[in-house]
Curated annotation (Swiss-Prot):
This is Protein FUN14. It is a multi-pass membrane protein. It is found in: Membrane. Keywords: Membrane, Transmembrane, Transmembrane helix. The gene is FUN14.
Length: 198
């Protein structure tokens, strides 16, 4: 009992000493400012030296004023005029258009994957029952001859600047033409559905 009481007094006494010590710290005295300023001065000095050394390094690593162009050297050896080729610029334009189309596929695949993944994860049981029931109902109605389902007659309602969503969704998920859409849709769908329920 006395040991616990002494430890408690020691802890409280040390807390009170700490309060008094930090309450009246005279930072304007030369000795105290000198003691507290040494680590700060050292770190500022090292930081400044690092910045100066980095500046000198970057100054020396600047690109030179000369242009090192291999095609220019080849043209000088040919002694012919430098004329741009039309076929090359057409190929570059076509490559750029394909790259933009690829980026659109990746974006749309990721967007639809995240939206459908979160939706399926949040209402998965309800979605499953409604989906199965509607599928069975459509099959029963088609079997009776009351409805006819033809995927070729489905028109795309939403068109985003040269992107046919019907073609992208149906051919993209079932065919091999839009691999960027399929890969990013699948990855986004799986990640969103796994993380939505956590």
């Amino acid at each position: 009992m006395t040991l616990a009481f002494n430890m408690q007094r020691l802890v409280f006494r040390n807390l009170n000493v700490g309060k008094r010590m930090f309450k009246n710290v005279p930072l304007w005295r030369f000795n105290v400012a000198n003691k507290l300023g040494k680590p700060l001065t050292r770190s500022v000095g090292l930081g400044g030296a690092g910045i100066v050394a980095g500046g000198f390094y970057l100054m020396n690593r600047q690109p030179s004023k000369l242009i090192f162009n291999d095609s220019l050297g080849a043209a000088v050896k040919q002694q012919g005029p430098l004329e741009p080729t039309v076929g090359n610029s057409t190929a570059i334009t076509e490559e750029r258009r394909n790259k933009i189309s690829s980026h659109k596929q990746m974006f749309l695949g990721s967007l639809f994957g995240v939206v459908l993944g979160v939706t399926v994860a949040k209402i998965s049981i309800l979605f499953m029952y409604v989906g199965i029931t509607s599928m069975l109902l459509c099959e029963w109605l088609r079997y009776k001859g009351w409805i006819r389902i033809n995927l070729k007659n489905i028109k795309s309602v939403i068109v985003l600047k040269d992107v046919d969503l019907k073609k992208l969704l149906i051919d993209g998920l079932l065919g091999t033409e839009y691999m960027g859409f399929k890969v990013f849709f699948t990855l986004s769908f799986v990640l969103a559905s796994l993380n939505a329920n956590k």
